[in-house]
Amino acid sequence: MNASQKGKVIIEGDYATLKYERRLAHPREDVWKAITDPKELAMWFDNKAVIDGRNGGTIDFVSGPAGFHTTGRILVWDPPRVFEHEWHTAPHPQLPDGESEAVIRWELIRDGDSGTILNLTFSRLTKPTALRFASGLHAYLDRLSAQLDHRTLPDWQKTHDAAKGFYLS
């Protein structure tokens, strides 16, 4: 696990923002497909996704081992540059109040001839959720990188557990 790929947790009152930057040795179009195609998402993000890919469209995800149900409106759909959407999570035993205001922004920046810089911002999360999700999202991004590289995907739980130390403050 590489500490240089650690994200940032920015606390502002009762809310927080998670920020990650990953350099990926793949064209934006490949990364775009991996973050917007339900078949691709199912492999690395461990979710069932329905995406109405357009400005004003919707997302409907059932995510990860916990089975969080998330819906939202697509705020920006600009292939292969920006995918921004609401992240409204229904109440769940691990999130009793759910999340009603969160937004995820995936920004893909061309890096040289064939690489991509992925800037991921997960904003307007409640502070407890952000602290809980930081290492999990780190683990999912490691899985995204492995999928793009055609490597065996790392075990999410092991990666999540190993990344927890990066986000404890």
Where are the predicted features?
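Hydrophobic ligand-binding cavity/cleft-lining segments
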Residues: 1-48
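A conserved amphipathic terminal alpha-helix motif
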Residues: 3, 124-169
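Beta-strand/loop substructures that line and gate deep hydrophobic ligand-binding cavities in soluble
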Residues: 17-18, 91-146
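Short beta-edge strand/loop motif at the mouth of beta-sheet-based domains
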Residues: 19-20, 26, 39-73, 80-82, ...
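A short, structured loop/turn motif at beta-sheet edges
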Residues: 28, 75-81, 107-117
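Hydrophobic pocket/interface hotspot
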Residues: 31, 41, 59, 74, ...
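Tryptophan-centric aromatic hotspots in well-structured domains and transmembrane helices
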Residues: 32-35, 44, 77, 86-89, ...
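Residue-level recognition of conserved beta-strand positions in structured domain cores
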Residues: 63, 86-87, 120-122
